[in-house]
Structure formats: C-alpha cells, structure tokens
Amino acid sequence: MKDRVVLAYSGGLDTTVAISWIAKERNAEVVCVSIDLGQGGEDMETVRQRALGAGAVESIVVDARDEFANDYCLPTIKANGMYMKEYPLVSAISRPLIVKHMADAAKEHGGTAVAHGCTGKGNDQVRFEVGFANTAPDLEIIAPVRDYAWTREKAIAFAEENGIPIEQSKSSPFSIDQNVWGRAVETGFLEDLWNAPTKDVYAYTEDPGLGQAPDEVIISFESGVPVAIDGKKVTVLEAIEELNRRAGAQGVGRLDMVEDRLVGIKSREIYEAPGAITLIRAHEALEAVTVERELARYKRGIDAEWSNQVYDGLWFSPLKRSLDAFIDSTQAHVTGDIRLVLHAGSITVNGRRSGKSLYDFNLATYDEGDSFDQSMARGFVELHGLSSKIAAKRDLAN
C-alpha cells in the first residue's frame, strides 16, 4: 500500500504541480486539503475538482469561515494585533488553522506526511512546520518549492511536460494570499521600492480619492467581541464581512509597508484589510474608555508581543497561550458602542458610550459642575517628581 501525503492545496500553480510531483517522486497518494477562509474568488468546488484532475486521490474542502472568524480573527481583535504597528496578521493567523485541519485529515485518511508549497524566503514555511511540530510531530514534512528550488518557470514546464491542467500563465505578476480578514500582495514590479502600486494591485478596496459620501457606522462590543453594527446583531464573521464592504468602499485598510520577515530579510508588502483595521481601531477606542490606565499601558506591550508571536509562527507556543489568557482577562469591561466615520481612506472615531466607562464627566469637565478637587494636585505633583528632583540635585552638584 502506498504512503499518503496530505497537501495544503490552494488551487494555484505550485500546489497543483506538487500533486503530480509528490505522486511521482515519492510514489505516494496525495490527499488535498483546501480551506475556505472566506477568500472569495474561485468556487471551492472548482478548486476541489482541479486537485482531482491533477491526480489527487482525494480532495477535501473545509468550510472554516466561522471557525476562522471566532477562533483566529477575534483573538486578533482583542489583542489589537498589528505586527510592526501596521500589519493585522492577515496570512499569519490563517496558517495555524490550516495546520489544524491538515493534521486532522492526516489522522483520518492515514497520512504519514504533510506537504506545503512555501518558499524558503517566506514566513509561512515556519508557520506551517512549527505548527506541525506542535500538533502532529510524527508527520514527515515535504516542501518541494523550497527544498528543490522550484521557480515559476520550472513549475510551468513540469506541468506542460506531464499534462497537468493549469490556467495560470507567466503573465501573472503578483503573489496573492487572501481570506476574509484581508489580502496580501507581493512580488512583481512591487519589489522595486520606488514603484507605486497600480490600480490592479487592489481588489478589496476602492480608490480613496473617488469622492464617496462619508459612511458613519456604530460598532457594538460585548467583552471585546463585536456583536452589532448599527444596532443589528451580527456574528464575528458577519461583522468582518460587513465592514470589508463598507470600509472597503471608502478605500479604508490599504497598507504599503516594508516588513521585517522572520527569516531576516526585508520585504515590501501591499495589504488590504478594511474590516480588520476598522474593527481593531474601534476596539482600541473602546479600550481607551473602559480599561484602567496602568492595565491599558501594560496591555499595549502584551499586544505587541502577541503580534510578534503570531507573526513568527508561534501560535501554539506556551507564551502565546499565556498571553491569550492575560488578554482575555482584560476584556471583561470592554463593552459599549463606538461611532466612527469611514471616508477617503481614513477612520475617524467621533463617539463613544459604555455602561462600563471609566470616563467621569464631572471629573473631566472644566465647566460648572467640576467635582475634581484641584487642591490635591500640588502634593501629588511634588511626590510624583520627588525621586527625579533628588537625582537632579545630585547631578547638578557634580
């Protein structure tokens, strides 16, 4: 009986060619796993049939949209997850979910190995392989693109030589990864840092300069979870999809950044994440109202480390699990409504309300009704600056 290899199948050129290559080079049967993460585009049944046409003995499609939203996007919202303060971890949070379902498929279908189509330059090889090391350490890992130095030209030539049906051509300029949380675009002419993105780079967002009327939206949260938009109850997935549509129509969520990859190189990336960025900005605004000052300050550092852990492929690490527990504990009072305006590529918060708010109007106002006892301030200022005052006195004496 032949060994079985479970392949993470995207439907693209590299993983389509990998089916035949693994079957020939490893004398193995290939089981393809494709995950619906709300990426849109090609119908998943078309993707499944392509895998079978390329030689897979089985092709499995998993509808993981709600799971992705609830178990991967939602923790990112609670952690205000932004790598390098910009990137909302579009690809990074999807990889551990793919790993989970591939490990399940290997167990169910008798797989002895798993395979992916990642290159040796990217972060995803780490995310996949460290993920498997944590969830299914006995599985062999096959990485033909990386380990056999595949190029696009070599993959196309192999497909033509072996009669593999592919629709992709050498004219496709970009490498694209997308899901409901966002879209990542790289390579092609974008590798020259001076080249500005052209209109065809974007798909999730409209041109911010088109002059649409502003869109005002109210996002409601309960314990850090988005539960309603403009008063209408939504699931997490529905919240992301609705804000992808509305924020995307306003050109919100475009990023053009040079990113520090885990492997040590810098890479230019174009991202579109209208729903993700809108939800994170709204969540940050509500935390500013409901989370105590010292806790909020400390959480910002935890959020940054959480983002680093996830970006670096350590979703399953003990540290990341501990960070999850801390972050969840901070969300008990993050309940309320944030009103914001989406317009011309920008997000402007213009309203906040919460029954858990720490904002006290009578303490904050400078007008009549002020209940803040300003006589306490003098002593507070003296004590607050005492240690630095003593140090300054010493330094001046020397």
UniProtKB/Swiss-Prot annotation:
One record GO biological process: urea cycle
Binding of ATP, residues: 8-16, 117
Residues involved in L-aspartate binding: 119, 123-124
EC number: 6.3.4.5
Range of residues in the leader sequence: none
Pathways involved: Amino-acid biosynthesis; L-arginine biosynthesis; L-arginine from L-ornithine and carbamoyl phosphate: step 2/3
Keyword terms: Amino-acid biosynthesis, Arginine biosynthesis, ATP-binding, Cytoplasm, Ligase, Nucleotide-binding
Superkingdom, taxonomy of origin: Bacteria
Enzyme superclass (EC): ligase
Protein residues bound to L-citrulline: 87, 123, 127, 175, 259, 271
HAMAP family given in the database record: Arg_succ_synth_type1 (MF_00005)
NCBIfam families: argG (TIGR00032), PRK00509.1 (NF001770)
The protein, known as: Argininosuccinate synthase
Organism: Corynebacterium jeikeium (strain K411)
